[in-house]
């Protein structure tokens, strides 16, 4: 049986960990845009995990399904190898300009990102087999 205090402590610990990691201005803006548009985004804890996974794997080519406003993409790009390319797919084409703005705001050169509008199940068959070091599923595929 879990004590009531333990649940409250866990909630407080989660808030602390989310607030502990400072966010760049670009990430703050992408978070704000996601909130304004009602678009889901990864938490700061999940973002740091994505950054770490991209870094330790030495990822140079990452495929992300679910672009949103660019929050997870910013974390991935921060962890990727220098010059690495993020290809990101989203079925909501109206979100892609927001992500593009977030990447530009973070100083990411445009040749390091490839944004594709469409359903992942339609787009994936056209992607290069074995062309990615890491694939992140963070959105709808169909």
List PLM regions with ranges.
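N-terminal auxiliary segments of SAM/dcSAM-dependent transferases
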Residues: 1-22
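S-adenosylmethionine/decaboxylated-SAM
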Residues: 36, 40, 44-142
């Amino acid at each position: 049986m879990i004590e009531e205090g333990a649940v409250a402590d866990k909630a407080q610990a989660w808030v602390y960990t989310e607030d502990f990691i400072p966010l760049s201005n670009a990430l703050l803006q992408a978070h704000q845009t996601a909130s304004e548009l009602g678009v889901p985004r990864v938490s700061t804890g999940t973002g740091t995990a994505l950054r770490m996974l991209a870094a330790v794997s030495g990822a140079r080519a990452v495929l992300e399904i679910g672009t949103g406003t660019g929050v997870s993409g910013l974390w991935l790009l921060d962890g990727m190898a220098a010059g690495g390319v993020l290809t990101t797919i989203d079925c909501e084409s109206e979100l892609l300009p927001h992500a593009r703005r977030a990447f530009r705001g973070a100083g990411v050169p445009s040749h390091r990102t490839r944004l594709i509008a469409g359903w992942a199940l339609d787009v994936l068959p056209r992607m290069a087999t074995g062309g990615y070091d890491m694939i992140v599923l963070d959105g709808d595929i169909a």
